[in-house]
């Protein structure tokens, strides 16, 4: 891509990819959306092998690394209050520039998910290879484009990237739409990941009822979706639940204003992608 000078700005929340966690289920009611996670140290824990987003009659398959980066791109937009259209544009761009991979190489000095060039004012090499920073810098420039939400995806992407191949982003629009719809929560229960066993040692829960890994999930989720996100270890499934051993969490998003459902699914899909 060509450079687009702008003063670098770092906006980062979250502390890295979650490990040792398994999505157990998602419950939707008229009151809350609850995402339940299991972090069971007594047996082998999962490692993602493949993820699939399905919306309508279209499905998109991505690797765990791609899913994690796509989820970060969507979560940064969520933090900034940007629409799903912005996420679609960003994902189409990342597909074209890097295949949604955090590359340590590129044309001239281009690096990272969006192949941003440090020499052109996008940030330091370390910054543009930070997915959270890179997504934020992309959105910094996207929101400066007048009417970007009404423009064709490829034109909006090109207005930011100034690529030598301005129409190439259109090739990825359909896949980007599917991922964006799932990761922004507009398409409920639309992201799943296949897993294979990976060993983790057992952990002891603390006085709050959390194991260290479960506490890490709670902190990570709140860093992205709000410090006031209610997270509980309350046991709701009788003897079948693992809440009483600190191995499961319930995450609640209130539904009063109608937004909780979408936000809840956005958080749930982020958790799936980052398991």
Each PLM stretch: what is its role?
Residues 41-161:
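Active-site-adjacent loops and short helices of periplasmic peptidoglycan-processing enzymes
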Residues 120-122, 164-166, 255-259:
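A generic structural motif
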Residues 59-60, 65-111, 197-274:
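Secreted/periplasmic proteins that engage bacterial cell-wall peptidoglycan
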């Amino acid at each position: 891509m060509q450079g687009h000078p702008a003063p670098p700005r770092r906006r980062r929340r979250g502390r890295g990819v979650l490990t040792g966690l398994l999505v157990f289920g998602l419950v939707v009611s008229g009151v809350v959306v609850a995402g339940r996670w299991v972090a069971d140290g007594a047996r082998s824990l999962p490692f993602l092998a493949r993820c699939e987003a399905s919306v309508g009659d279209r499905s998109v398959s991505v690797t765990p690394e791609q899913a994690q980066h796509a989820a970060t791109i969507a979560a940064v937009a969520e933090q900034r209050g940007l629409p799903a259209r912005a996420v679609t544009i960003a994902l189409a761009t990342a597909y074209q520039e890097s295949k949604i991979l955090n590359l340590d190489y590129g044309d001239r000095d281009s690096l990272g998910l969006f192949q941003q060039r440090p020499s052109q004012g996008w940030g330091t090499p370390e910054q543009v290879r930070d997915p959270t920073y890179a997504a934020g810098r992309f959105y910094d420039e996207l929101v400066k484009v007048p009417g970007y939400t009404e423009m064709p995806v490829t034109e909006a992407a090109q207005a930011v990237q100034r690529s030598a191949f301005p129409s190439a982003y259109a090739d990825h629009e359909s896949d980007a739409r599917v991922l964006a719809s799932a990761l922004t929560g507009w398409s409920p229960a639309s992201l799943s990941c296949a897993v294979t066993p990976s060993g983790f040692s057992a952990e002891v829960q603390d006085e709050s009822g959390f194991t260290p890994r479960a506490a890490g999930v709670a902190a990570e989720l709140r860093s992205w979706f709000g410090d006031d996100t209610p997270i509980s270890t309350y046991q709701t499934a009788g003897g079948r639940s693992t809440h009483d051993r600190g191995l499961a969490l319930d995450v609640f998003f209130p539904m009063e204003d109608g937004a909780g459902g979408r936000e809840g699914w956005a958080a749930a899909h982020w958790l799936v992608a980052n398991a």
